[in-house]
Amino acid sequence: MDLKTAVFNAARDGKLRLLSKLLENKAKDDVVLLMSEKTNGATPLLMAARYGHLDMVDYLLDQCSASVEIGGSVNFDGETIEGAPPLWAASAAGHLKVVRSLLVHGASVNNTTLTNSTPLRAACFDGHLEIVKYLVEHKADLEVANRHGHTCLMISCYKGHKEIAQFLLEKGADVNRKSVKGNTALHDCAESGSLEIMQMLLKYGARMEKDGYGMTPLLSASVTGHTNIVDFLTQNPQTSKNERINALELLGATFVDKKRDLLGALKYWKRAMDMRHSDRTNIVSKPEPQTLIMAYDYAREVNTAEELDNLIADPDEMRMQALLIRERILGPSHPDTSYYIRYRGAVYADSGNFKRCINLWKYALDMQQNNLDPLSPMTASSLLSFAELFSFMLQDRAKGLLGTTVTFDDLMGILCKSVMEIDRAVKQTAPPPDQVQLNKALSIILHLICLLEKVPCSPDQDHFKKQNIYRFLKLHPKGKNNFSPLHLAVDKNTTCVGRYPVCKFPSFQVTAILLECGADVNVRDAEQNSPLHVAALNNHPDIMNLLVKSGAHFDSTNSHNQTACDLLDEKEMAKNLIQPINHTTLQCLAARVIVKHNIQYKQEIPEKLESFVLLHR
């Protein structure tokens, strides 16, 4: 074990005697350097503070001149916090004495993590009241919010820490501050079921505001299923009749899909129905639907107490009611609307009703693409779910275990929607598309193409498929490392796109159809690797031969001056199956000589040949 690791382990484990022995006779500059070096993303002081070793913290600061501010990576409850200063780690872990020591040694009380979380927020999160008080006494700013605009008061409310919330309010915390998404502390109480804190916030002048999705705290409580909050707020005289009705109906939908309590749902729907009909001269009717939705099996919302009573005999109809109610009240842009449509579809798939699942998922996907930004993680998740479902259906069909077939139209429809998502993304210039999400979307498309190759189709369908693949390639999308779709098709890492296996890559079939549809065989990635280079790295001679037959230049070099043949593994059979001499022309040999001897060639030979020589650099 090297000295750096030994020092790190000793600091983490609080072994002061061992640490002092390790640093014995070391030059001061060497010790200071050791204090700033990181193991697994953390300095020795950060680890000592995280685990509450006060004597170690004091020793590192006083004797080793450790920096009191250098942040690093620390783990709390399975989550890695990046850029956490020692004071943040000690505050989060509840080590008051260490917090005192760090502040005495000059730690900045408002120094934040990479997500802009302060030590005060860390203490509020885990309910360390004494540390909260101590930090505030030492000028901690109550109003510094994290990157989501979430304040110390908000997190205290969400986590149900009443005493901390009360202390912050007494110290002047802004009770009506809004997060980036428009949440207030009242929303956090509603989402966590913290009724006592909510009542306290109202005494301090908290207002019932809507968030970015148009959600009031009352609706937030309905979505999360906190009946205590819903009951309290529906009795509030300031809550309108319509708001009460919507809250009770939405709570019923939550009981169906989240709590799986159909009788509980009926109870709240009956209360709402009674409220709708409480004034015979002014019945509050539900809006008439413009169209009935095929994905919901053409269900319509019940309008009378009698219709509601009849639901008890039809659980499936109740589940459709829940989806209809949620979409009406929350609207299509709220994440819960599409989430529970997808959830219901998954339940159908688990019971073998794949057609209902596909219809619901298609409806949810349309909703997401119409309302979310391009390459939203939620949309990508929907597309991936389709790929996984179709893969499962094809496998079970092949084994003779499944009566339902995957149709060309189903698969092709999702491929078209996936290509549309890429089209939306590449047209978005500000901000540019997220490379990780774009790479994932490209990989999903290749998996869908792979699955399509397993489904029989007519000549017209085959033409339509190739038309769409051509349109996809003409968008010239580039994923991580500037990979083109052809690079991804010949890379084994494309296999790992989700939790469940879909298709295996490199894929000869996908490579072949991409080439047939016009993929550039000599396109380069960020390191000037062609698809041939990537195929060589993956030791796939069949695909390499296919690429060469399609015009791939065999001895072109990447930015490390390597040809594809140089990248083949000596231990693999592929090296023996690829014969460079069969693919090397006299023109190639001449270009290599020009490059090797640095012979002037620009403006001496035709422009076409200049680009040819460049391939051999």
Swiss-Prot record:
Disulfide bonds: none annotated. GO terms for molecular function: ubiquitin-like ligase-substrate adaptor activity. GO terms for cellular component: Cul2-RING ubiquitin ligase complex; ubiquitin ligase complex. TPR repeats lie at residues 245-279, 338-371. Pathway: Protein modification; protein ubiquitination. InterPro entries: Ankyrin_rpt (IPR002110), Ankyrin_rpt-contain_sf (IPR036770), TPR-like_helical_dom_sf (IPR011990). ANK repeats lie at residues 2-31, 40-70, 82-111, 115-144, 148-177, 181-210, 213-242, 481-523, 527-556. It comes from the Eukaryota. Keywords: ANK repeat, Repeat, TPR repeat, Ubl conjugation pathway. PROSITE patterns: ANK_REP_REGION, ANK_REPEAT. GO terms for biological process: proteasome-mediated ubiquitin-dependent protein catabolic process; protein ubiquitination; ubiquitin-dependent protein catabolic process via the C-end degron rule pathway. Belongs to the fem-1 family. Substrate-recognition component of a Cul2-RING (CRL2) E3 ubiquitin-protein ligase complex of the DesCEND (destruction via C-end degrons) pathway, which recognizes a C-degron located at the extreme C terminus of target proteins, leading to their ubiquitination and degradation. The C-degron recognized by the DesCEND pathway is usually a motif of less than ten residues and can be present in full-length proteins, truncated proteins or proteolytically cleaved forms. The first seven ANK repeats at the N-terminus (1-242) are essnetial for recognition of Lys/Arg-Xaa-Arg and -Lys/Arg-Xaa-Xaa-Arg C-degrons. Component of a CRL2 E3 ubiquitin-protein ligase complex, also named ECS (Elongin BC-CUL2/5-SOCS-box protein) complex. This is Protein fem-1 homolog C. It comes from Xenopus laevis (African clawed frog). The gene is fem1c.
